[in-house]
């Protein structure tokens, strides 16, 4: 009996060292013991750390307000204020809807909740006006996976080309195959106007790259569980698939919709047909963006989109052509503007790059002449700067390079100022 009492006294908590007599409870697990006091302490530590982690996660996932979203877009994208407002509200409502559905899922369902339906976005506007960049910047702010697809590369299932499921694969790849993250991402489909059907009436023959693609996109736009082949390509019966629910993926589809303004103008009776009608070849004579703001579903149907496809794109945002003044701002003002990027490259070679006002205006004018908008600015900058950047690493005597209007037009060589000896040696 004394020996049993002695062995009980020898049992101690493996963590704090207290004996069985000094604590209320001693729990055995294999060759170790833990007392009730250590268990309580562990629970407090876990609760504290989990609480901090949840707080950090909440701060990280704080949903920005529409005004904050628009202000963030302003730091990267010049102009397009009406489109920014529409996109900011649409994106805010979309992710607010996701949070609401998660909250409803966590609490008791005592009464039926109002169902919030997803609102995908249609963007109308000319090439080089910033449609893609707006979508990319939104994804950057929200820290969600983002994928870009070209509608012209898509074909209906069973035909040569790219299946619509490959769009979802791109999103999965952007999310490092994290399905949960991918299901909250953004997919941008460009050139959607190029998949309009060939006539307003339903086609008798197969239109595999037009109406057929629109039909294939319907399900993923609305929400479906798609089977995605991890390696891409066509589906085979024996391969493994990743199941991806598209219900909460935000789709932004965009296109130039050249010719849609005529459809809208005809509906409004602004133009007639026949002799005596003044025909203008200059788009500048009519504010196309203002006309696009009056777009109605029947106009898009006449253009070649099927009604079911239009119905999945309730939010419409229009972007305008950038004028010379706006293009100059694109070159200089955004946080990652082209001028700032090239100036940084020159700094790495211990030189200062300076553009005069007339040089910036000339670059903007060339982009307007080429009808490439902001998208063509980098190519023009490269044409001007590549010869200089080729020689600069070998020119230790150069401290500053000045680009003026004549240089931008190709009529003169850039002015190169000598480097200060102290700066180069430093």
Curated annotation (Swiss-Prot):
Residues 1-54 form the ClpX-type ZB domain. It holds the Pfam family zf-C4_ClpX. GO terms for biological process: cell division; proteolysis involved in protein catabolic process. GO terms for molecular function: ATP binding; ATP hydrolysis activity; ATP-dependent protein folding chaperone; protein dimerization activity; unfolded protein binding; zinc ion binding. Signal peptide: none annotated. Keywords: ATP-binding, Chaperone, Metal-binding, Nucleotide-binding, Zinc. ATP binds at residues 126-133. InterPro entries: AAA+_ATPase, ATP-dep_Clp_protease_ClpX, ATPase_AAA_core, Clp_ATPase_C, Clp_protease_ATP-bd_su_ClpX, ClpX_bact, P-loop_NTPase, Znf_CppX_C4. It comes from the Bacteria. Component of the ClpX-ClpP complex. Forms a hexameric ring that, in the presence of ATP, binds to fourteen ClpP subunits assembled into a disk-like structure with a central cavity, resembling the structure of eukaryotic proteasomes. HAMAP family: ClpX (MF_00175). ATP-dependent specificity component of the Clp protease. It directs the protease to specific substrates. Can perform chaperone functions in the absence of ClpP. This is ATP-dependent Clp protease ATP-binding subunit ClpX. It comes from Corynebacterium glutamicum (strain R). The gene is clpX.
């Amino acid at each position: 009996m004394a020996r049993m009492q002695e062995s009980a006294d020898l049992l101690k908590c493996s963590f704090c060292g207290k004996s069985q007599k000094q604590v209320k409870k001693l729990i055995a697990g294999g060759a170790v013991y833990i007392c009730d006091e250590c268990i309580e302490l562990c629970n407090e530590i876990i609760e504290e750390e989990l609480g901090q982690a949840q707080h950090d996660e909440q701060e990280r996932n704080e949903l920005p307000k529409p005004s904050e979203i628009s202000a963030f877009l302003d730091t990267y994208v010049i102009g397009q204020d009406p489109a920014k407002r529409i996109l900011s509200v649409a994106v805010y409502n979309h992710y607010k809807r996701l949070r609401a559905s998660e909250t409803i899922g966590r609490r008791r369902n005592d009464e039926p909740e109002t169902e919030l339906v997803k609102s995908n976005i249609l963007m109308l506007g000319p090439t080089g006006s910033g449609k893609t960049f707006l979508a990319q910047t939104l994804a950057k702010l929200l820290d969600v996976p983002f994928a870009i697809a070209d509608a012209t590369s898509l074909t209906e299932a069973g035909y040569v080309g790219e299946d619509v499921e490959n769009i979802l694969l791109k999103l999965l790849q952007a999310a490092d195959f994290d399905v949960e993250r991918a299901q909250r991402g953004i997919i941008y489909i460009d050139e959607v106007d190029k998949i309009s059907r060939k006539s307003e009436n339903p086609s008798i023959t197969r239109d595999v790259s037009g109406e057929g693609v629109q039909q294939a996109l319907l399900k993923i736009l609305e929400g479906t569980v798609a089977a995605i082949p991890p390696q891409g390509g066509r589906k085979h019966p024996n391969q493994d698939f990743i199941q991806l629910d598209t219900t909460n993926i935000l789709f932004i589809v965009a296109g130039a919709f050249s010719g849609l303004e005529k459809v809208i103008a005809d509906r409004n009776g602004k133009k007639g047909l026949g002799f005596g009608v003044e025909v203008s070849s200059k788009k500048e004579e009519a504010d196309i963006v203002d006309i696009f703001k009056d777009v109605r579903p029947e106009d898009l149907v006449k253009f070649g989109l099927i009604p079911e496809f239009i119905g999945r794109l309730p939010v419409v945002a229009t972007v305008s052509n950038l004028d010379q003044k706006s293009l100059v701002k694109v070159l200089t003002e955004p946080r990652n503007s082209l001028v700032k990027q090239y100036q940084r490259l020159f700094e790495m070679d211990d030189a200062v790059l300076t553009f005069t006002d007339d040089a910036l205006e000339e670059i903007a004018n060339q982009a307007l002449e080429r009808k490439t908008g902001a998208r063509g600015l980098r190519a023009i900058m490269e044409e001007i700067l590549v010869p200089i950047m080729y020689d600069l690493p070998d020119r230790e005597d150069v401290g500053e390079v000045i680009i003026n209007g004549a240089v931008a037009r190709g009529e003169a060589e850039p002015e190169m100022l000598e480097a200060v000896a102290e700066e180069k040696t430093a």
